Amino acid sequence: MFKIPDLRKRILFTLAMFGVYRLGASVPVPGVDLEAVQRLTDSGSQAGIYGLLNLFSGGALETFSVFALGIMPYITSSIILQLLTVVIPRLQKLQEEGESGRKVITQWTRYITVVLALLQSTGLTYIFSRGSLTGGISLIPNYTPSRVGLIVLTMTAGTAFIMWLGELISQRGIGNGMSLIIFASIISQLPASFGGAYQVTAGQGRLGQFSFLVLMFILMIVGIIYVEQGQRRIPIQFAKRVRGRKVMGGQSTYIPLKVNSAGVIPVIFATSVLFFPALIATSLPQDNSITAGIRNWIDVNLANSQGTSWFYIFFLGMLIIFFTYFYTTIQFDPVRQSDMIRRQGGFVPGVRPVSYTHLTLPTICSV
């Protein structure tokens, strides 16, 4: 593999970008109380909404670094544009224009990413100054406009830098840059997770429990890979057409339908949605019994539930299921795909006449 110069350069470039990303994840935002950040790290609060946000940021949120927002604003921006493509004809036409249209959509995605980063960084700054999501530990002393502005601009610039890194990896590295950054973020948390599990189990003489956890982790990885690689292939046959003296078409191909075509995107989007109730709860006044009750309920069941509240588990699960269904529908439109196949003279073998293909493909996708 390393004997191929171009492949070697791409691998080394990707690893170098990973190093830059991990370096930025350890640089704290100016204006943050580092002692409070250390207390938060020592407390080990890694569950609930805070734990999910910290996971996808690669631990950058735990240290309140310049990359604390991670790649989540970009993912949210991409999903928003894909949703708008369904309802705005102009965006749909741009998507069908090929490379030139994709460049315009990519540019709009960048603009929306910066706007979302400004909004999310402002919300996180406000929440962390009030001690929400952090067990009452305030990370930002002296909550002044100048300090808040500095923190917000720094975190927004960090998100823009991560977006640029992802695009560089896509162009000069291996694979999709944004997906690899998410992968690097999650992988970076494994040593600390295994270290904590070892201290709790093997460090207290329960080596069997630690071995069982490692075995279950490996089996889960194997199972995830198995499901991720699973696909249903729908055979497509193209009819022969005569143009002059040439016979066109007649070849066979297939449409690969993945079992999990949405990937981890619905989980990220659901986590972003869960962030807003915590922000609203922080803004509610406590001098009123009704608003104080609502705020306490959100804190117990969502913001600081540590992932054990039944409502948190149910609500997050429903959000993931909804966004998975919705995102899959947007990613692959069976009706449009069927029309394209029909216009090109293709059909599903065993399904005649050709006009029935537009009914067959959506039915298979629903199953």
Regions found by a protein language model. Name each.
Residues 1-93, 100-356:
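N-terminal cationic and glycine-rich segments that engage phosphates or anionic surfaces
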Residues 357-363:
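Conserved small/polar residues in nucleotide/adenosyl-binding loops
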